[in-house]
Amino acid sequence: HLWLVRKKDGKLQVLLQRRAKHKESFPDRYDTSSAGHIPAGSDYRESAIRELFEELGVHAKAEDLVYCGTRRVVYDGEFCGKPFHDRQVSKVFYLWFDADESAFNIDPAEADRVLWMNLDACIDGVRHNTFPHCIEMDELEILCSGLKVDFA
């Protein structure tokens, strides 16, 4: 998972993308700047920059991504009304990137808009579920660790 980060008016901001309305999982919910599944054996950084370009039209270099940590998910239950078994290993990265929301070339198959949000407001909103999202608190904690900022 790749987070685009910038500093604006002295505060850290993260770019969120709102998933497209037709997506089977989490439609109309805000998510990580860019994320995707990678083929077995593929490089995490190369996959992250490929997804970033496909989803948002942003070119980046693998060496510019800052590694924050690894997130593991093991889930057995129900999702979208069907039995679901999820096994994920996600590498969490961030990339310093400052551009207006209108500058992104959003793939409508993936998302319908992007939004810069202050990091502390994002954490608070996810914690208290005050905006539609599919962001996990543990991922924000990993991001904050990589950014070397307090996870409030």
Predicted segment positions?
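Conserved Nudix-box catalytic region and its N-terminal flanking loop in Nudix hydrolases
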Residues: 11-58
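A short coil-to-beta-strand element that immediately follows conserved catalytic motifs
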Residues: 59-70
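Nudix hydrolase/Nudix homology domain
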Residues: 28-30, 34, 69-152
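Secondary-structure boundary elements
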Residues: 9, 57-61, 100-103
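Short, flexible active-site-adjacent loop segments at beta-strand->alpha-helix junctions, enriched
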Residues: 8, 20, 71
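Short arginine-rich
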Residues: 2, 58-61, 128-134
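Conserved beta-strand and immediately adjacent loop positions that scaffold enzyme active sites
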Residues: 1, 13, 113
